[in-house]
Amino acid sequence: MLINTDEIKNIYVAKQFCDMRKQIDGLALIVTSQFSMNVLDHSLFIFTNASRNRIKMLYYEANGFWLFTRRLENGKFKFKKHEESGVLMITPPTAQLAD
C-alpha cells in the first residue's frame, strides 16, 4: 500500500542537514521542536544529509507514520535556494526533486 499523495497538504524541505541515522521519532522531534510544526498535519517532511546524496521523507497518514529513504549512487539531490526560515515549503503540484 502506498500513500495517497492527494492528501499531502504541503511539502517541507529541512534547511539544515540531518543525521541519517535518525528514524521516525528523531525526525518527528525535529519537526516539532526545531520547526514548531505539527508532524500529524498531512505534510511531507524531507531531510537530507550533508553530501546531499541521501534523503529521508517523513509523513503521517491515518494511524501511522511512513518513512521513505532514497540514496543516490551518483549525483546529488538539488533543491531551490532556502529562505531564512528553517524549512522551505513547496506545494505538491510543483514539487520536484532532481537527481
Regions found by a protein language model. Give the residues of each.
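Polybasic/polar functional segments that serve as interface/processing modules
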Residues: 1-99
